[in-house]
């Protein structure tokens, strides 16, 4: 029984690639055919590759390591946040700030600032400050929350894998993962370079349902791995 069925992939539109003029020739092995100027992805390959990625993510989770979900394009933002939260993992879904992993000490000072502002809002400090200052602080908090809210509890040294939607868009995140030797699992569309990724899941990275389906399977793998870790203890 495969982790993901052909029926699920078809229903979510995972097979629709990009226009033929916008392709990366390295994706040729994952392309089934061309239809009306659009490449159709070979879903048999997707089934197999999704299974490999699932097993890897499950092992990472079972070993007690964390996974960071990265998807900042509009179609990915919600699914990345929801599935990371469901599996109790970390996510970046608005903007990858340079050094998020490779210069975590600097990022940590901004996370501390966000925590401080959260505290001020909760303990009533905002109620006694001048209105103008509160507006300024709330705007600062919103911006920090948007960029760092998904990694507030992150321990960068315990990241065992990165799951990415659209490696072309998230090249900075992938570059940092490479520097730190963190394996990358990604939904790779027909316009991407599969060689940038350790575990390629060939598929449509522009359809909300397609992203949700695959991100959801990665979250399932994490949850299954965590259960295995608890059983081993």
Curated annotation (Swiss-Prot):
Entry-linked InterPro entries: Ribosomal_uS2, Ribosomal_uS2_bac/mit/plastid, Ribosomal_uS2_CS, Ribosomal_uS2_flav_dom_sf
GO biological process annotation, one example: translation
HAMAP family named among the record's database cross-references: Ribosomal_uS2_B (MF_00291_B)
Any one annotated GO CC term: cytosolic small ribosomal subunit
Matches recorded under PANTHER family: 30S RIBOSOMAL PROTEIN S2 PROKARYOTIC AND ORGANELLAR, SMALL RIBOSOMAL SUBUNIT PROTEIN US2M
Molecular functions per Gene Ontology: structural constituent of ribosome
UniProt protein name: Small ribosomal subunit protein uS2
This protein's UniProt keywords: Ribonucleoprotein, Ribosomal protein
Similarity annotation: Belongs to the universal ribosomal protein uS2 family.
